[in-house]
Swiss-Prot record:
GO BP term (any one): negative regulation of Wnt signaling pathway
Phenotype when changing residue 324 to G: In OS1; associated with disease susceptibility; has diminished ability to antagonize Wnt signaling, in vitro
Protein name: Secreted frizzled-related protein 3
Disulphide bridges, residue numbers: 35-96, 43-89, 80-119, 108-147, 112-136
Organism of derivation: Homo sapiens
Medical condition linked: Osteoarthritis 1: A degenerative disease of the joints characterized by degradation of the hyaline articular cartilage and remodeling of the subchondral bone with sclerosis. Clinical symptoms include pain and joint stiffness often leading to significant disability and joint replacement.
Residue ranges of every copy of the NTR domain listed in the record: 178-298
Gene: FRZB
């Protein structure tokens, strides 16, 4: 038998991978788990219908994977990245083919990075971070190993991801798919969203690079800032997605309210941000709102300190009989 013979070992060492794979399939105990139909509801719309367990996150069954992937439903609902669902399914329900049955195929590093860039700002906003078990650093690069990306999959109906006209090698969400939910600048919204920065700025340029849109603006006035330094100069507002929401027009002047990425010292223009045409009246309103917000914050702090002091005092005299004695 070729597999067990010295000649077979020599052939294996010589790099005849096809023969080696055949040998492994025939050796008892070396057989890998077979492909199985995708049963994870979130992943049934993806362009592959066969997967294999355990997956890249070491879930032994799809039932376990379903419970784990459900935690991302809320993040998927924000549409923070067109690559997020593809990336998650490539990790939780990896594609399985006859040619690659021994080890699930990993998603490409670039897919992970695009998903993280688009969605990490949303996670940061709610005091979370990108999950460590979904780290991009260890994933293969497209031209150095076997991996999958949306660009590499063409369905019977053609490519699911249209070509980006600004980069022939990049495919992403088309601008026609971007539906921005308008948010008006009101005191209620300002209090609820608690923005990290508010600036008056003129839009100089909108840069589109693959799955990222960046707005280049000239800062005219800083109405509010937090930890990230904002110069009275040209700065970038990072959307970290293929959509510019809220929309901006070049050469127009806006009042912009958004969030920041402290770790990267970036100003973010993401879901929940506001951009309205600049009006002096609106600028004055926002300054008043911010003063109220600061006052409310101080009042709450003073109130809690007062309550704490009062409770300590009342604690010492909690028993009237003891006090009289």
């Amino acid at each position: 038998m070729v597999c067990g013979s010295p000649g077979g070992m020599l052939l294996l060492r010589a790099g005849l991978l096809a023969l080696a794979a055949l040998c492994l399939l025939r050796v008892p105990g070396a057989r890998a788990a077979a492909c199985e139909p995708v049963r994870i509801p979130l992943c049934k719309s993806l362009p592959w219908n066969m997967t294999k367990m355990p997956n890249h996150l070491h879930h032994s069954t799809q039932a376990n994977a379903i419970l784990a992937i459900e935690q991302f439903e809320g993040l998927l609902g924000t549409h923070c990245s067109p690559d997020l669902l593809f990336f998650l399914c490539a990790m939780y329900a990896p594609i399985c083919t006859i040619d690659f049955q021994h080890e699930p195929i990993k998603p490409c590093k670039s897919v992970c990075e695009r998903a993280r860039q688009g969605c990490e700002p949303i996670l940061i906003k709610y005091r979370h971070s990108w999950p460590e078990n979904l780290a991009c650093e260890e994933l293969p690069v497209y031209d150095r190993g076997v991996c999958i990306s949306p660009e590499a999959i063409v369905t019977a109906d053609g490519a699911d991801f249209p070509m980006d006209s600004s980069n022939g090698n990049c495919r992403g969400a088309s601008s026609e798919r971007c539906k921005c939910k308008p948010i008006r600048a009101t005191q209620k919204t300002y209090f609820r969203n608690n923005y990290n920065y508010v600036i008056r700025a003129k839009v100089k340029e909108i840069k589109t690079k693959c799955h990222d849109v960046t707005a280049v603006v000239e800062v005219k006035e800083i109405l509010k800032s937090s930890l990230v330094n904002i110069p009275r100069d040209t700065v970038n507002l990072y959307t970290s997605s293929g959509c510019l929401c809220p929309p901006l027009n070049v050469n127009e002047e806006y009042i912009i309210m958004g969030y920041e990425d402290e770790e990267r010292s970036r100003l973010l223009l993401v879901e929940g941000s506001i951009a309205e045409k600049w009006k002096d009246r609106l600028g004055k309103k926002v300054k008043r709102w911010d003063m109220k917000l600061r006052h409310l914050g101080l009042s709450k702090s003073d109130s809690s300190n007062s309550d704490s002091t009062q409770s300590q005092k009342s604690g010492r005299n909690s028993n009237p009989r003891q006090a009289r004695n």
